[in-house]
């Protein structure tokens, strides 16, 4: 059986969601996990996945924390999905539908958030008319990360201009460019003993602020042509070209016997060019 939950932009703004994990916590049938401190990792019906993510129906499986500043809605599907997306999944998928320019309208929406740890978030969403049958929409996002743990900090920057052209009453063209620049400290948490975290170590960070770092720089070009076939059907042609450069390196507690903590670490660079 399949079930779908849809979280809209209004829901995201009203609840103050800032990342995929925030949405997952409010969605039945799925859970979120740590993702080693550098990526979205969702558990669909008991099976963890870092790959079953889509953007406008196109696979988006590079491992990073996805921002919500340019999202119109998030679709969470639990159940079989190979016929819908051309590949099998672990038990579900998450599809982000991005914001498109609105022809004939001019508006600007500003969001600002801050928490008690000093983290802050700023987002601007502006749409303006460029012609009788065209419009441009620009979304910009920047945040500074902080929490209760020592050394934890980071920043994220996102820019996404979109142009919409209404070619005819039946045909619409959307062209999008997205740039992302992320950096953050990696905190893998504290050791466990007998299946539970050792709370006596809760104030200790097992890592090095000069080593436990992840960075991401990405550019994504998207083009989509939508043609209305009838009152109940339409045809879509989507093309995505993207480039990702990501670095993930960390030290973490790999073993603990109650008195001695064993440390380990690794370096994981990713360079990915996609054309879909």
Each language-model region and where it sits:
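A short, compositionally biased micro-patch
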Residues: 25, 37, 47, 77, ...
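Membrane-spanning beta-strands of outer-membrane beta-barrel proteins
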Residues: 37, 89, 119, 154-156, ...
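Residue-level marker for the onset of beta-strands and adjacent loop->beta junctions
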Residues: 38-40, 49, 122, 147, ...
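Soluble non-cytosolic domains of exported or imported proteins
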Residues: 6, 14-18, 117, 154, ...
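Acidic, small-polar-rich N-terminal luminal/periplasmic segments of exported/outer-membrane proteins
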Residues: 1-105
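Acidic/polar loop-and-plug regions of large Gram-negative outer-membrane beta-barrel proteins
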Residues: 143, 147, 159-228, 234, ...
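Outer-membrane beta-barrel translocator/receptor signature
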Residues: 69-72, 83-161, 167-171
């Amino acid at each position: 059986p399949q079930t779908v939950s849809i979280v809209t932009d209004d829901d995201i703004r009203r609840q103050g969601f800032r990342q995929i994990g925030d949405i997952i916590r409010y969605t039945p049938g799925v859970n979120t996990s740590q993702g080693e401190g550098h990526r979205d990792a969702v558990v669909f019906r008991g099976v963890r996945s870092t790959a079953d993510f889509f953007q406008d129906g196109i696979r988006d499986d590079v491992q990073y924390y996805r921002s919500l500043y340019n999202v119109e809605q998030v679709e969470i599907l639990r159940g079989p999905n190979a016929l819908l997306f051309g590949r099998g999944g672990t038990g579900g998928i998450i599809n982000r539908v991005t914001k498109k320019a609105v022809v004939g309208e001019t508006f600007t929406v500003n969001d600002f958030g801050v928490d008690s740890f000093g983290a802050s978030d700023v987002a601007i969403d502006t749409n303006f008319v460029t012609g009788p049958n065209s419009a441009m929409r620009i979304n910009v996002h920047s945040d500074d990360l902080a929490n209760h743990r020592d050394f934890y900090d980071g920043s994220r920057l996102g820019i996404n201009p979109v142009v919409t052209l209404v070619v005819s009453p039946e045909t619409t063209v959307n062209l999008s460019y997205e740039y992302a620049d992320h950096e953050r400290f990696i905190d893998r948490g504290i050791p466990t003993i007998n299946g539970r975290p050792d709370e006596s170590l809760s104030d200790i960070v097992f890592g090095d602020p000069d080593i436990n770092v992840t960075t991401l720089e990405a550019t994504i070009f998207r083009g989509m042509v939508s043609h209305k076939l009838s009152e109940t059907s339409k045809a879509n042609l989507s093309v995505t070209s993207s480039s990702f450069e990501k670095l993930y390196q960390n030290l973490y507690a790999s073993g603990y016997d109650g008195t001695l903590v064993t440390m380990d670490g690794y370096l994981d660079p990713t360079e990915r060019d996609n054309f879909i």
